[in-house]
Amino acid sequence: MDELLKILGANALESRANIARMLNVPAAEVDARIAAYEKLGVIRGYQAILDEDKLDLDTVTAVIEVKVTPQREGGFNTIADRISKFPEVRSAYLMSGAYDLLLFVEGKNLRQVATFVSEKLSPLDGVLSTSTHFMLKTYKRFGVLMHQETSDERLSVAP
C-alpha cells in the first residue's frame, strides 16, 4: 500500500505539511496525490471514530447475519445492494460461512431494530433467514481501543 495511504489511514487529520515531511516530497504533491485518490474513489471519505459511551447516545447497534438466495443475474450483489440502501444499515459485508451477509444496523431502541428485521429485511425476496445479535459494549473500533486502562494493576494469570 502507498505510504501516503498508510499515513492517512492512521490519522486523516495529519497536516499536509507533516505528511510532506514524512514522505520527503513537496506539499503540493501530497495535495495532488490525495485529490487523485479521491477522484479515483480510493479514498471514499473521512470519518471520526467516536466513543459512543462518552456521548451517551440513545442508539442500539445490532449485528445481523443474513442467509440469502443468490439471484440468477446478479448473484449476491443484487440483494446486498438492495439491503445496503436501507438507512438503518450502517455497514454490509459478503461473508463465507453459514450466513451470506453480515450487517451492522442502528436504531433508536431494540423495538426499532426488531421492526427493521421483521418488516423490512425478512420479507425481502431472497432473504431466507436472519440471526440478530445486539452489541452490548465496544472494546475496539477500527483499530482504536475504546476503553484505556487507567491503573497499573496487572491482570492475574490463572495456572
Specify the residue positions occupied by each region the protein language model found.
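A compositional/biophysical signature of low hydrophobicity enriched in polar/charged and small residues
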Residues: 1-159
